[in-house]
Amino acid sequence: MFKIICVTDRKLCDEDFLTRIEKIASAKPDRIIFRDKNCNDEEYVKSALKILAISDIYHVPCSMYFHTEIFSDIHMTMPMLQHICLSDINFQHFVGVSVHSVDEAIQAEQQGVDYIIAGHIFETSCKPDLAPRGLEFLKQVCESIKIPVYAIGGINANNINQIVQTGADGACIMSGFMTCKSPVAYISQLRKAVTEK
């Protein structure tokens, strides 16, 4: 089944962040990835524990950035992966990595990660100065590895079906989840768009 994943960005949220997280969790995305580049480690862990408590209530898997000593479901950047050995991490960890090239995707799979996020695919306000890598790049990534590939970058209800057509296993969405009026209605719209021919 094609997965819809929420990636957080506190800066985009115009209401209490944890209130927004609860609304998103109640809408049942396939996963929430807690991303916050604007806080220190201590603040991140405190927020992460609160978010994990919310996601557990709604039975939504939640990935945290790194902090392998605390969390078992983690996401990391490629530079982070290159500085650790996954075999040294508890085998119970579920690990995802963000990649920006086919070579990185292959390397991540060889190092034993469970999934990758590839991007950015379409133009996005999050990376205004970087050209999108496009659908052909995403298709090449999907054809190069066997683990799940999730796309990210500028994805919405109007283009998510193009992501499906590349063979990707899911889509990660940030601004849509952070700014929509109703996460329940928003995710329903996305799931409907996924199945359109």
Predicted regions and their residues:
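Glycine-rich phosphate-binding active-site loops on the catalytic face of alpha/beta enzymes
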Residues: 6, 74, 78-88, 117-129, ...
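Short, acidic/polar
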Residues: 11-25, 67-68, 100-107, 156-161
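Structural motif
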Residues: 24-27, 111, 144, 165-167
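N-terminal active-site wall of soluble small-molecule enzyme domains
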Residues: 31-89
